[in-house]
UniProtKB/Swiss-Prot annotation:
Annotated signal sequence range: none
Subunit structure: The channel consists of an ion conducting pore forming alpha-subunit regulated by one or more associated auxiliary subunits SCN1B, SCN2B and SCN3B; electrophysiological properties may vary depending on the type of the associated beta subunits. Found in a number of complexes with PRX, DYNLT1 and PDZD2. Interacts with proteins such as FSTL1, PRX, DYNLT1, PDZD2, S100A10 and many others. Interacts with NEDD4 and NEDD4L.
Domains (record comment): The sequence contains 4 internal repeats, each with 5 hydrophobic segments (S1, S2, S3, S5, S6) and one positively charged segment (S4). Segments S4 are probably the voltage-sensors and are characterized by a series of positively charged amino acids at every third position.
Organism annotation: Homo sapiens (Human)
Protein name (Swiss-Prot/TrEMBL): Sodium channel protein type 10 subunit alpha
Reactions that this protein is recorded to catalyse: Na(+)(in) = Na(+)(out)
Record's subcellular location: Cell membrane
This protein's record includes keyword Transmembrane helix: yes
Domain IQ intervals: 1851-1880
Length: 1956
């Protein structure tokens, strides 16, 4: 994009006059003329780039500063457009005071007002004025507030309508209405305004109260805020973009849900109507039972008002005695939950997908249909819910990233242009300098219209801003203390940082603390560092980014007070003005000439021009500085004067002492400990504290407050306020201390819990020393910053929908509230009658709970409105906007966010303090050791030579890593071998070696090495160690790592390795010879010891192999050292016999059969645990059998353990984690067995121990590869997960303590317990606790607490977990909202704004922290992939493209098509069946079949059933016919296609189901024939195969297919966890009372029932219901003395066990496993999308081979050259080369074999190359491919290519030339002979020379053709390009093409094909 030179003139801005309009008309006419001319030359037109509008001159943007100052008289006036793009458009621009660009049409507005009309100009001036938009914004906000009120008069509405009308009129007058560009209706935002106004008038004109719908549209006014606030439009753009992207996912979702809904319809229709009815009723009346009309004949489910559902199957729910299960007329939940018709089934499935109270539907369905249908729910939840919902997340994330990328690109484009402009200015300046004009002196020139601010002020600003002690302060004794300890890290600051994506318009992220080392200006450029830094021009000091404008610091006096002194008048050094060498692509010559044109000879003009250049540059710099400046210069100087305290030497001395004290690492440690202790004190508050305890807490609070105040005061004195307040942490401290002091002052007058909660923020001070917390807060900070606009959008959405709900449904809720409110309440909890409650409902929908409110809404209002409103909020708000939130959060995670602390180069003080303590500990230990060793000397073992594998690092970058992680001594040379005892000596002597600076792994420079020098590192490694030995060395290293953890002080010593290498290794002294072929000198800088002789290593390696037949040592070296008797000589008797025994055991243990046997036993013993349920005592035989098998298993496992001890030795056995697990579990079995024999088995701990045997399967699974991968991934993620868990706990601690402050003791209430039902005693009877005691005459009143409450911090955590998972949160919220004071009876919504506490917690505690789990797990996945990822990391993007294309190519080969039958009739059918039209017809029929299945309902008439039955028979007949036809035509080949087999099975099943339903009507109750019909639905999958167009959907399914293996592994692991937990649940909670979520079907009494419960809470659904009965501890909730059937007593739970059981299960399954599931899906979705965007996909190769089959029916893999042109044209997609294509094909230089045939692989390679373009990487990949192809096609014989197409063409042309020459020779000769005077014209033509192109070609070639020997010699498999074309392609120029083109295409067709 050209930079308009004119725009740099000083008179940039010209008024828009009639002349300007005439000029535009001329330009347009000229453009029209050129357009016509251009149409004649079509080809040129394509190549020209169309002009595009300039990015920084878009409407609504601010005009960049370098266009100059805008004169005051031109503000708001029409100006000529600066953007050259609009020079041919009838437009002009207007700038307001803030330099915002507005564009207007220069045509007449409303056909009346020209741009020069006074009225229109006034309107324009008003419309662009900033106050106008401000006024409108304020109006909108006021209007929004008014709309939330119900009590305001109607007239106010008219006022707003008038204001909006006025706004619209002004805009229409200024812009015109709609015909031309930039008119009013051309802006989509104005459509909104216009419709709002129109509807307002319609509503007023037709005064119908009924049209509340029209009044609702007023609400859309709130959306106008979007159009007024600029940043919001971008986010709305992203939203719309993501909604567009969701099209594919939406189709897939609807498709999947429809299929599932159909299955649900077939399986469950009518079932949910089954209820338990009193037995004495007459059966014939049952048809019209309705639970509304006759509630007394039903029995209700305990604790609810819902009738009890039941089923007639054996495994469904049963009725209690006296009741019978009958089908009634209505469904549960106001008749809205059912599968009775397709629509209701679809709604139920959508609810399952969004997982909203799905456990309720799950329980209802299983109760009525049977437990076996859990399978249906497993499929729907895992495939439907997890997969589809997360696909939405994946798509939204991707759309966001694309949008982000686009914005970044735009910014970069702007930046590039800006740099070009500056480059131009710089060149102008050079020219001026050459012409002798002093640019610096021009600063004082008054003539410059642009110099807005005086130079001195600017000079002030150009001084390096004092960020923390600026450059000049170094000289003064007061240099900033913070930076002294940073000085040593200057290297870090200036070294290579990770390239943050810098750009001009980046804003500093809110949480980022930019503090620079001393002597570094804010630009990151060191004084005197004048290298040219390529970087972002406008961004001065981004985070650690080097700015491109190196400024030399100005000479400054050391005293800041005299800053206004002599330097005031110095001209700034030129380096300020000349931006340093900015790296810009050079301008084209044309533009350079402009600078040196004759203008410069004109003296006055030159001066002015120079001035303008200078002032523009300075204004650019000003712009740059303003963006960086923190505060105005006058304030800076004032603050430096008054906030830096240096009054007298005593004071300075005090400062120095305090400085030492405050910066000491131990001070930081003390403060951190104080914060921790203070937090613990705050967390100890609880309900019912004793006065002494309370007093202790109070005193503690005072002490801590004093302590923190002292810390603050000391710091202020030590650092001076000026520097103290430049650190954000210090400001934070200061605020908290001030609030704490305030609270202490106010505490006497009454408790201010608001201020008390401020103290909680102290916890965040931990972030200073805890990097993860810091990072997390930053992530939240960053995303809140990025989310600022999104949050506003979300707020607007919530606001708009809340208002819509209030307007549309408010009245309905008021009038019909009795339908849905509880009997004793006036209002329901959730309603839309007022704005606040309406807002809460919308917020609740955003949390994912919509269905219950929707039922209530449908009960009171119009069903359609409710459905539309709730589903819209759900889809828009929850699925799109909330996922965009998550996308932003995930985006904030960068690779090492959580593992690496901030790399600001600052040593963490805490680490230093801890390191000092460590050193002290080591020294003490050493002193003690030396003291004792003097008194009793130890025998020192002989030092062994070390085996150190050389590090492959030559680069100096490695030094950092080496110094940090391996203590090698500072010399870097060889290290003396030393004994094992000395390993700490160098550390103690020189503690700086590895303790002082623990560099986190993320910061080590090795990462950089991986990034930029991956290949170097590899190649170096290969240089040093020959390839073969490398692997062996790695294996040795791995072995060493595996067996002994290496200490930092040693390499892998031979002693460490000895046990694994057998005895012999130790006895030899191994010579240290450098590796073969490597010189001594090549020893790398950081290595300790050169490599051992590889021969030696190779000799030892076999002994390391897995099938090593020799066992290890029994004992570790430590044992042998301390107890030499353990060292046995196995060569002497009697030990040699023992050795043989060990070898035998070893062989047994290592045998695969032994392993299989043990795994089988493990599975059996695990299975036996499943039988030990609640009813075991009623089955004596089973019990006896289990006891017996238990003993057998125990003995087997003990025997296995003993065998392994003997075989492996203790050392190996006890260093293996899996063996430890075994050991513990065997011990548990032993203990429980012993206890059984001693008759202690009923002791509770022993029973609990026995359940731990369920952990055994873990070991079996360690043998399964897939499972192990998941476990490894999990183990790898554990540190990060624990970190996040800890941070969550800290975050939640604040809310928990706050909850305790707000609600402790306020949840108690008086309840009435009658007939097993609980009810709250009305406030009129009981007011407080004492009333409850007094009124309790009947003994049925109880003063109880809500089970989950905020009485202490631990309970608070449980309550918060329920709120965060949205399970059970309602009861907690209701209790909080109803609470009054301690010991008072609650009152309905007495404390209504407590809802906000929960809203805030859900946003910060729930939303952010729980989604961090997804972030962390995904992050970890990516990191582990990086560690494991092989070639990917070292491949460029280009290489990857080729690699992927080739990968796909390799798996394919040509197949023989099914031969057409010879029989005439069969052939006819074959032609029909193989047509695409036939397939499409079948697809249409499948869809029709699906539709007829949708039509079915539960209560359909007999007639309808019959018709549907007939239709079904018709479809079965059609599909059978299709099947028969295909079998007839395709014969035995029919079964070679998977789809055909599938069809065949479906048809057989369909026929079977028809026969069954016809013969056995009686079987229907057991065996629904419709189930078979469900199978037919699977045929719909065929549609996806056919539609190549449905690429997006196929990508999504492809992602699913890719995810399946991983998901299966995760599922297995999840099953394992469920198994273990269900065994545990069976032993812990079998007898709990049935209430809430536990009943006769869902309980922990049998294994199956436990699994039902655990599957449900895998998604966290309904875990509160299962936990509730377990929290019962005594009356009235349960009876501890109730006898149970198995001999135990009581039906109470054990709260502690229950809470641990459920919280751990929720964390493992819901937070970790399910998030792994999400991570896999997101990952594979990205991969699949990348694959689908690649230029060549699998389909293209499939298509190639499909087309190939037609041209090569015998699958010979060759086609003739003559057929190639047609073949290339027949292909579709990117590989196709349309006709005329002969020239292109010839130039492809394809190898020919005898018979002019070409091999398919050659063609495919050439076509692939044609699509992907030339690339050097093809060669290696091609060779690779050929090998692969040969492997898959063994039939292929080698063949010799004898020529290539290009060679053939050349020979052909040569032949023609020779022929022509010969003909002319013959002609001349005959002429000479006959001596005829005149030559006939035709012969003259024939004799003429060949055309120009060919002559050029032959001259160029010198007519040299390659040797035959050179091409034909290579025999290849199949031929490679090189073998055939080596001699040619290097020499042949593209001139061939001209010769070929010049030849007539027609003649070339007739040419004779070449002979061999």
């Amino acid at each position: 994009m050209e930079f308009p030179i004119g725009s740099l003139e000083t008179n940039n801005f010209r008024r828009f006059t009639p002349e300007s309009l005439v000029e535009i008309e001329k330009q347009i006419a000229a453009k029209q003329g050129t357009k016509k001319a251009r149409e004649k030359h079509r080809e040129q037109k394509d190549q020209e780039e169309k002009p595009r509008p300039q990015l920084d001159l878009k409407a609504c943007n601010q005009l960049p500063k370098f266009y100059g100052e805008l004169p005051a008289e031109l503000i708001g006036e029409p100006l000529e457009d600066l953007d050259p793009f609009y020079s041919t458009h009838r437009t002009f621009m207007v700038l307001n005071k803030g330099r915002t660009i507005s564009r207007f049409s220069a045509t007449r507005a409303l056909w009346l007002f020209s741009p020069f009309n006074l009225i229109r100009r006034t309107a324009i001036k008003v419309s662009v004025h900033s106050w106008f938009s401000l006024f409108i914004t304020v109006t909108i906000l006021v209007n929004c507030v008014c709309m939330t009120r119900t009590d305001l008069p109607e007239k106010i509405e008219y006022v707003f309508t008038v204001i909006y009308t006025f706004e619209a009129l002004i805009k229409i007058l200024a812009r015109g209405f709609c015909l031309n560009e930039f008119t009013y209706l051309r802006d989509p935002w104005n459509w909104l305004d216009f419709s709002v106004i129109t509807l307002a008038y319609v509503g007023t004109a037709i005064d119908l109260r009924g049209i509340s719908g029209l009044r609702t549209f007023r609400v859309l006014r709130a959306l106008k805020t979007v159009s007024v606030i600029p940043g919001l439009k971008v986010i709305v753009g992203a939203l719309i973009h993501s909604v567009k992207k969701l099209a594919d996912v939406t189709i897939l979702t609807i498709f999947c849900l429809s299929v599932f809904a159909l299955v649900g319809l077939q399986l469950f229709k009518g079932n949910l109507k089954n209820k338990c009815v009193k037995n004495d009723m007459a059966v014939n009346e049952t048809t019209n039972y309705s639970s509304h009309r006759k509630p007394d004949i039903y029995i209700n489910k305990r604790g609810t008002s819902d009738p009890l559902l039941c089923g007639n199957g054996s495994d469904s729910g049963h009725c209690p005695d006296g009741y019978i299960c009958l089908k009634t007329s209505d469904n549960p939940d106001f008749n809205y939950t059912s599968f009775d018709s397709f629509a209701w089934a679809f709604l139920s499935l959508f609810r399952l997908m969004t997982q909203d109270s799905w456990e309720r539907l799950y329980q209802q369905t299983l109760r009525t249909s049977g437990k076996i249908y859990m399978i249906f729910f497993v499929l729907v939840i895992f495939l439907g819910s997890f997969y589809l919902v997360n696909l939405i997340l994946a798509v939204v994330t991707m759309a966001y990233e694309e949008q982000n990328q686009a914005t970044t690109d735009e910014i970069e484009a702007k930046e590039k242009k800006f740099q070009e402009a500056l480059e131009m200015l710089r060149k102008e300046q050079e020219v001026l300098a050459a012409l002798g004009i002093d640019t610096t002196s021009l600063h004082s020139h008054n003539g410059s219209p642009l110099t807005s601010k005086n130079a001195s002020e600017r000079r002030h600003r150009i001084k390096p801003r004092v960020s923390e002690g600026s450059t000049e302060d170094n000289k003064s004794p007061r240099s900033d203390p913070y930076n002294q300890r940073r000085m040593s890290f200057l290297g870090l600051a200036s070294g290579k940082r990770r390239a943050s994506h810098g750009s001009v318009f980046h804003f500093r992220s809110p949480g980022r603390d930019i503090s620079l080392p001393e002597g570094v200006t804010d630009d990151g450029v060191f004084p005197g560092d004048h290298e040219s830094h390529r970087g972002s021009l406008l961004l001065g000091g981004g985070a650690g980014q080097q700015g491109p404008l190196p400024r030399s610091p100005l000479p400054q006096p050391s005293n800041p007070d005299s800053r206004h002194g002599e330097d005031e008048h110095q001209p700034p050094p030129t380096s300020e003005l000349a931006p340093g060498a900015v790296d810009v692509s050079a301008f084209d010559a044309g533009q350079k000439k402009t600078f040196l044109s004759a203008e410069y000879l004109d003296e006055p003009f030159r001066a002015q021009r120079a001035m303008s250049v200078v002032s523009i540059i300075t204004s650019v710099l000003e712009e740059l500085e303003e963006s960086e400046q923190k505060c105005p210069p006058c304030l800076t100087s004032l603050s430096q004067k008054y906030l830096i305290w240096d009054c007298c030497p005593m004071w300075v001395k005090l400062k120095t002492i305090l400085f030492g004290l405050v910066t000491d690492p131990f001070a930081e440690l003390t403060i951190t400990l104080c914060i921790v202790v203070n937090t613990i004190f705050m967390a100890m508050e609880h309900h019912g504290m004793s006065p002494t305890f309370e007093a202790m807490l109070q005193i503690g609070n005072i002490v801590f407050t004093i302590f923190f105040t002292a810390e603050m005061v000391f710091k202020i004195i030590a650092f001076d306020p000026y520097y103290y307040f430049q650190k954000k942490w210090n400001i934070f401290d200061c605020i908290i201390v001030t609030v704490s002091l305030l609270e202490l002052g106010v505490a006497k007058k009454g408790s201010l819990s608001v201020l008390r909660s401020f103290r909680l923020l102290r916890v965040f001070k931990l972030a200073k020393s805890w990097p993860t917390l810091n990072t997390l807060i930053k992530i939240i900070g960053n995303s809140v910053g990025a989310l600022g606009n999104l949050t506003i959008i979300l707020a607007i959405i919530v606001f708009v929908f809340a208002l819509v709900g209030k307007q549309l449904l408010g009245e309905n809720y008021r009038n019909n509230r009795k339908n849905i409110s509880a009997p004793h309440e006036d209002w329901p909890r959730w309603h839309m009658h007022d704005f606040f409650h309406s807002f809460l409902i919308v917020f609740r929908i955003l949390c994912g709970e919509w269905i219950e409110n929707m039922w209530a809404c449908m009960e009171v209002g119009q069903k359609s409105i409710c459905l539309i409103l709730f589903l819209t909020v759900m889809v828009l708000g929850n699925l799109v906007v909330l996922n965009l939130f998550i996308a932003l959060l995930l985006n904030s995670f960068s690779a090492d966010n959580l593992t690496a602390p901030e790399d600001d180069g600052e040593v963490n003080n805490l680490q230093v303090a801890l390191a000092r303590i460590q050193v002290f500990g080591h020294r003490t230990k050493q002193a003690l050791c030396s003291f004792f060793s003097r008194s009793c000397p130890f025998p020192q073992p002989k030092a062994e030579p070390e085996l150190v594998v050389k590090l492959p690092l030559s680069s100096s970058k490695a030094e950092n890593h080496i110094a940090a992680n391996t203590a090698r001594g500072s010399s870097g040379g060889l290290q003396a071998p030393r004994g094992p005892r000395d390993e700490h000596s160098d550390f103690i002597a020189n503690p700086t070696v590895w303790v002082s600076v623990p560099i986190a792994e993320g910061e080590s420079d090795l990462d950089d090495l991986e990034d930029d020098g991956g290949e170097d590192a590899q190649s170096f490694q290969q240089e040093v160690i020959p390839k073969g030995q490398q692997e062996q060395l790695q294996q040795v290293e791995r072995c060493g790592d595996h067996l002994t953890p290496r200490s930092p002080g040693t390499g892998t010593s031979s002693e460490d390795l000895a046990p694994s290498l057998g005895e012999t290794w130790k006895d030899e002294s191994v010579p240290q010879v450098p590796a073969e072929g490597v010189d001594d000198t090549s020893s790398s800088e950081g290595s300790t010891v050169d490599c051992l002789d590889p021969e030696e290593i190779l000799r030892k390696i076999p002994e390391l192999a897995d099938d090593l037949e020799e066992p290890d040592d029994c004992f570790t070296e430590g044992c042998i050292r301390h107890c030499p008797c353990c060292k046995l000589d196995t060569t002497k008797s009697p030990w040699d016999v023992g050795w043989q025994v060990r070898k035998t055991c070893y062989r047994i243990v290592e045998h695969s059969w032994f392993e299989s046997f043990i795994i089988f036993m493990i599975l059996l013993s695990s299975g036996s645990l499943a039988f030990e349920d609640y009813y075991l005592d009623q089955k004596p035989t089973v019990k006896a059998l289990l006891e017996y098998t238990d003993r057998v298993f125990t003995f087997i496992f003990v025997f296995e353990m003993l065998l392994k001890w003997v075989a492996y030795g203790f050392k190996k056995y006890f260093t293996n984690a899996w063996c430890w697990l075994d050991f513990l579990i065997v011990n548990i079995s032993l203990i429980s067995l012993t206890a059984k024999i001693l008759e202690y088995s009923e002791v509770a701990p022993i029973k609990a121990l026995r359940t731990l045997r369920a952990l055994r399967p873990l070991r079996a699974l360690s043998r399964f590869e897939g499972m192990r991968v998941v476990v490894d991934a999990l183990v790898g993620a554990i540190p990060s997960i624990m970190n996040v868990l800890l941070v969550c706990l800290i975050f939640w601690l604040i809310f928990s303590i706050m909850g305790v402050n707000l609600f402790a003791g306020k949840f108690w209430r008086c309840i009435n317990y009658t007939d097993g039902e609980f009810s709250l005693v009305p406030l009129s009877i009981v007011n407080n606790k004492s009333d409850c005691k007094i009124q309790n005459s009947t003994g049925s009143f109880f003063w109880v607490n809500v089970k989950v409450n905020f009485d202490n911090v631990a309970m608070g955590y449980l309550a918060l977990l329920q709120v965060a998972t949205f399970k059970g949160w309602m009861d907690i919220m209701y209790a909080a909202v109803d609470s009054r004071e301690v010991n008072m009876q609650p009152k309905w919504e007495d404390n209504v704004y407590m809802y906000l506490y929960f809203v805030i917690f859900i946003i910060f505690g729930g939303f952010f922290t729980l989604n961090l789990f997804v972030g962390v797990i995904i992050d970890n996945f990516n990191q582990q992939k990086k560690k494991l990822g092989g070639q990917d990391i070292f491949m460029t993007e280009e290489q990857k493209k080729y690699y992927n294309a080739m990968k796909k190519l390799g798996s394919k080969k040509p197949q023989k098509p099914i031969p057409r039958p010879l029989n005439k009739f069969q052939g006819f059918v074959f032609d029909i069946v193989t047509r695409q039209a036939f397939d499409i017809t079948i697809m249409v029929l499948i869809c029709l079949n699906m539709i007829t299945m949708m039509v079915e309902t539960d209560d359909q008439s007999e007639e309808k059933t019959k018709i549907l039955g007939k239709i079904n028979q018709f479809f079965v007949a059609v599909f059978t016919g299709e099947c028969v036809m295909k079998m007839f035509a395709l014969r035995q080949y029919y079964f070679t296609n998977g789809w055909n087999v599938f069809d065949f099975i479906v048809v057989v099943l369909s026929i079977a189901s028809l026969i069954f339903s016809a013969i056995l009507k009686s079987l229907q109750s057991y065996f629904s024939p419709t189930l078979f019909r469900v199978i037919r639905l699977a045929r719909i999958g065929r549609i996806l195969r056919l539609i190549r167009a449905a690429k997006g959907i196929r990508t999504l399914l492809f992602a699913l297919m890719m995810s399946l293996p991983a998901l299966f592994n995760i599922g297995l692991l999840l099953f394992l966890v469920m198994f273990i937990y269900s065994i545990f649940g069976m032993s812990s909670f079998p007898h709990v009372r049935w209430e809430a979520g536990i009943d006769d079907m869902f309980n922990f009494q049998t294994f199956a029932n436990s699994m039902l419960c655990l599957f449900q809470i895998t998604t966290s659904a309904g875990w509160d219901g299962l936990l509730s009965p377990i929290l019962n501890t005594g009356p009235p909730y349960c009876d501890p003395n109730l006898p149970n059937s198995n001999g135990t007593r009581g039906d109470c739970g054990s709260p502690a066990v229950g809470i641990i059981f459920f919280t751990t299960y929720i964390i493992i399954s819901f937070l970790i496993m399910v998030n792994m599931y999400i991570a896999v899906i997101l990952e594979n979705f990205n991969v699949a999308t990348e694959e689908s965007t690649e230029p060549l996909s699998e389909d293209d190769f499939d298509m190639f081979y499909e087309t190939w089959e037609k041209f090569d029916p015998e699958a010979t893999q060759f086609i003739t050259f003559s057929a190639l042109s047609d073949f290339a044209d027949t292909l579709s997609g990117p590989l196709r080369i349309p006709k005329p294509n002969r020239n292109i094909l010839i130039q492809m230089d394809l190898p020919l074999v005898p018979g002019d045939k070409i091999h398919c692989l050659d063609i495919l390679f050439a076509f692939t190359k044609n699509v992907l373009g030339e690339s050097g990487e093809l060669d290696s990949l091609k060779a690779n491919m050929e090998e692969k192809f040969m492997a898959t096609n063994l039939s292929k014989s080698s063949y010799e290519p004898i020529a290539t197409t290009l060679r053939w063409k050349q020979e052909d042309i040569s032949a023609t030339v020779i022929q022509k020459a010969y003909r002319s020779y013959v002609l001349h000769r005959s002429m000479a002979l006959s001596n005829t005077p005149c030559v006939p014209r035709a012969e003259e033509e024939a004799a003429s020379l060949p055309d120009e192109g060919f002559v050029a070609f032959t001259a160029n070639e010198n007519c040299v053709l390659p040797d035959k020997s050179e091409t034909a010699s290579a025999t290849s498999f199949p031929p490679s390009y090189e073998s055939v074309t080596r001699g040619l392609s290097d020499r042949v120029n593209m001139r061939t093409s001209s010769s070929i083109q010049n030849e007539d295409e027609a003649t070339s067709m007739e040419l004779i094909a070449p002979g061999p």
